[in-house]
Every structure is written in structure tokens, then in C-alpha cells.
């Protein structure tokens, strides 16, 4: 699974593994879902998967989560006491996260802005700010694409640790632009490319093309990307503060996002956020693929 956007309540948590131990000797039995009631003692169990489960309010004590994998999960309001975090990799949206009494969010934000000075421009509030932000997006993507072109073509379809391949990443960005720009802002009744790829946890929708098994060439996807990025460029080039502060006109046809009126700022900010984050993920995975190639 590759969707690296902010988690959703309906997200699939495929791949999440919990290893639950007690001090009591017992045969190893595979854990089953749904989740145990709070306070229930579970004997040693083999690795299992919990998918689309609700653990709200659950209590885990003397539990071994070593090498566990959490994807598209909510930890809002979670409390960890006496936790041992070592060699832990966390990637996600963080707000009001305190470790040993210290809110780490400002520290993480400052370090990310130090590593990527242009990142500070990617949360615009006015039309000129959006023009600056889109200029950043247009500048950072070409070197990433050139890096991908140096790999054997088959590696561009290869996933790294279950994350989207490079071509799947580009397909998803086409889908994001089709949804939030071509449909929501431009009001097109049929905005979608058949090669677009929605986030993995999206519910099936016959009105939105989504073929995870498609294997288009890099050139095919880049042609689509060029067209979609040009569309965004044209919209932002003529954007005014009044338009940015307004709402989109609802599109009556079924599709995604659902028919309704959306803040123009939200639509454009979503696309910019997707473009920025997925390029970082692509760069990370390209480095691994380069070692394989």
C-alpha cells in the first residue's frame, strides 16, 4: 500500500502485526479478531494481522510490538507509558506529540525546513503564495524523473516495502489532480484518466476509474503528468485572492470527491501537498532501487 496522504478513518491497516505475550506458559495460538476486550489476558501468539479494526480505548500492557508494522492508523489521544522506542521509524501527520514531556512537533518542523528550505513556501494562504509554491513543485520534480529514467524500466514498476512503485506514484498524482482540480475546480463531469490510481484504501466506485493492475510505460504516464501539471499551472497563474477564498461549484455527476462545494484553497493545497510528499517518498525509494539495479 502506498497512500502516504493523511490517515482516514476507513483506511485499511493491512500489514499491521501485533505480537502479544504474557508471562504465563502456553501453546502458541494465532490471535483472532475482533480485538480483545480491555483487560483480557492473551497467551503468546504468532504474528497476525488486524485489518480495519477499532481499538479505541483498548489497553495494551506488557506487550511486545517489536518489528510490528502499522500503516494508515490513528493514534489520536493515545498514551504510551514505560515505552521502549529503539530503532523506530515513524512517518505521518503529527500534532501535539510529546515525548518525555517535550512537544517534538516544532523540533521536527524546524529540522524539515532546514533540510528543505523551500518547504516553508508550501503552506500558502494567498494567490501569490500559491504561485510560489507551484513554482517549487515544478522545479523539484524534473530531477526526480531524470533519476528514475536511469533505472531499468522493470524497476519502475517495483514496490519498496509495500509502497507504491515510481509509476504508481505518478499515476496517483494524476488521480489527485483529476479529482481536486479537473473535477472539483473545473467542474468537468468526466475528469478522470483510466490510468489514474486512487489511494489503496479507497472504497470501490464505478464512476472513478481505478486499475491497480495496469502497467503503463513511464512515457505514457509522463505524458499525462505533463498535461495535468500544465492545467494546475494555468489555474494558479491567473488565481486571485477572491477566487482562492471562494468555493467550487458542485458537480452533480457521481465521482470523487463527492458532489458538493469545496474551498478552492483546500483543493489546491491538497494537490501541492500530494506533489511534495510523494516526490520525497519517490526519492527515498529510488535510492533503494538504485542499489538493486
PLM region spans:
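Short, low-complexity, charge-dense intrinsically disordered segments
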Residues: 26-27
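Alpha-helical packing segments of well-folded alpha/beta enzyme cores
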Residues: 133-140, 144, 173-176, 217, ...
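Short, linear, compositionally biased motifs with a strong N-terminal bias
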Residues: 12-13, 31-32, 282
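Short, helix-capping/interhelical loops that line the mouth of catalytic, cofactor-
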Residues: 107-133, 181-229, 289-293
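Tandem repeat scaffolds
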Residues: 31-114
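Low-acidity, Ser/Thr- and Arg-rich intrinsically disordered low-complexity segments
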Residues: 3-21
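Short, contiguous alpha-helical
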Residues: 153-208, 230, 247-293
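Long, well-ordered alpha-helical segments
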Residues: 143-151
Amino acid at each position: 500500500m502506498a497512500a502516504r496522504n493523511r490517515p482516514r478513518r476507513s483506511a485499511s491497516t493491512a500489514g499491521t502485526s501485533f505480537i502479544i505475550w504474557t508471562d504465563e506458559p502456553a501453546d502458541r495460538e494465532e490471535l483472532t479478531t475482533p480485538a480483545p476486550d480491555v483487560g483480557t489476558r492473551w497467551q503468546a501468539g504468532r504474528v497476525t494481522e488486524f485489518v480495519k479494526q477499532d481499538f479505541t480505548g483498548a489497553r495494551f500492557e506488557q506487550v511486545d510490538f517489536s518489528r510490528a508494522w502499522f500503516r494508515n492508523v490513528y493514534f489520536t489521544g493515545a498514551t504510551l507509558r514505560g515505552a521502549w522506542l529503539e530503532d523506530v521509524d515513524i512517518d505521518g501527520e503529527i500534532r501535539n506529540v510529546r515525548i518525555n514531556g517535550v512537544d517534538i512537533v516544532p523540533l521536527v518542523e524546524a529540522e524539515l525546513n532546514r533540510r528543505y528550505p523551500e518547504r516553508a513556501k508550501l503552506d500558502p494562504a494567498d494567490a501569490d503564495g500559491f504561485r510560489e509554491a507551484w513554482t517549487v513543485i515544478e522545479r523539484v520534480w524534473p530531477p526526480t524523473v531524470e533519476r528514475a529514467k536511469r533505472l531499468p524500466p522493470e524497476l519502475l514498476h517495483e514496490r519498496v516495502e509495500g509502497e507504491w512503485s515510481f509509476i504508481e506514484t505518478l499515476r496517483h498524482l494524476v488521480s489527485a489532480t483529476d479529482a481536486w482540480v479537473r473535477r472539483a475546480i473545473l467542474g468537468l463531469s468526466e475528469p478522470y484518466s483510466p490510468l489514474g490510481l486512487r489511494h489503496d484504501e479507497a472504497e470501490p466506485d464505478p464512476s472513478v476509474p481505478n486499475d491497480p493492475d495496469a502497467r503503463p510505460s513511464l512515457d505514457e504516464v509522463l505524458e499525462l503528468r505533463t498535461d495535468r501539471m500544465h492545467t494546475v499551472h494555468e489555474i494558479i497563474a491567473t488565481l486571485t485572492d477572491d477566487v482562492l477564498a471562494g468555493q467550487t461549484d458542485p458537480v452533480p455527476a457521481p465521482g470523487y470527491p463527492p458532489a458538493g462545494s469545496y474551498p478552492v484553497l483546500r483543493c489546491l493545497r491538497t494537490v501541492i501537498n500530494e506533489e511534495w510528499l510523494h516526490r520525497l517518498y519517490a526519492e527515498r525509494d529510488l535510492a533503494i532501487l538504485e542499489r538493486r539495479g
